[in-house]
Amino acid sequence: MENRDIARLIDHTLLRPDATQEDIEKLCAEAVEYGFASVCTATCWTSFVREYLDAHNSPVKVCSVVGFPFGSALTDAKREETWDAVEYGADEIDMVINVGYLRSGMLDLFEKDIRTVVKVSGSAAVKVIIETCYLTDEQKVLAARTAKKCGAAFVKTSTGYGPSGARLEDVRLIREAVPDILIKASGGIRTYEQAKAFTEAGASRIGTSSGIAIVTGARGESSY
């Protein structure tokens, strides 16, 4: 896979809390220029991103995060945020699981949290962020299987806000355990070589704020 070919697998991401409208507009322009898969932002920017991409007749998708970055919001709050994101034009929803529910064995509430977001998302594809850095291998597999059971399209490894991001071994683990769910690797992927390794391990999407560096052969500086 060539550098430019990998662009179509990249969610071009800006999730810093200090991001300005000018920053988001630049992100959108870059996504259009390089042909990235999506523009991924906080929900407050969803309508702006939708309007920009539509105005430029771009096939780039609008991706909005829900319950980001900690996933500890009430399920009702996640439902409302998802509803708003879809109403404002999101094509994809990246939701953060409730890690505490999973680690506590509160599996009914854990599943309900995911299922609620998937249901409200309608035709928007849901990527379930399982924050692998906090989980055992058994919990990673359980989270991936639950995401699939609830109708999610993807499992996503990380928010980029935890102590570590994507790991090749986690992608391989999920791919082997749940072969019929797509995987988004995110967190710390800054070079073409890293992105290629994750796609070879089984990732179908790469979440990064270093998309331009990846496709141009440079090295990104962001932690996400």
Swiss-Prot record:
Q: What is its EC number?
A: 4.1.2.4
- Which domain of life does this protein belong to? Archaea
Q: Where is it localised?
A: Cytoplasm
Keyword Cytoplasm assigned to the entry: answer is yes
What are the recorded GO MF terms, alphabetically? deoxyribose-phosphate aldolase activity
Record: active site: 94 (proton donor/acceptor), 156 (schiff-base intermediate with acetaldehyde), 184 (proton donor/acceptor)
- What InterPro entries is this protein classified in? Aldolase_TIM, DeoC, DeoC/FbaB/LacD_aldolase, DeoC_typeI
The task this protein performs is described as:
Catalyzes a reversible aldol reaction between acetaldehyde and D-glyceraldehyde 3-phosphate to generate 2-deoxy-D-ribose 5-phosphate.
Could you identify this protein by its name?
Answer: Deoxyribose-phosphate aldolase
Identify the species of origin: Methanocella arvoryzae (strain DSM 22066 / NBRC 105507 / MRE50)
Identify the taxonomic lineage of the organism of origin. Answer: Archaea, Methanobacteriati, Methanobacteriota, Stenosarchaea group, Methanomicrobia
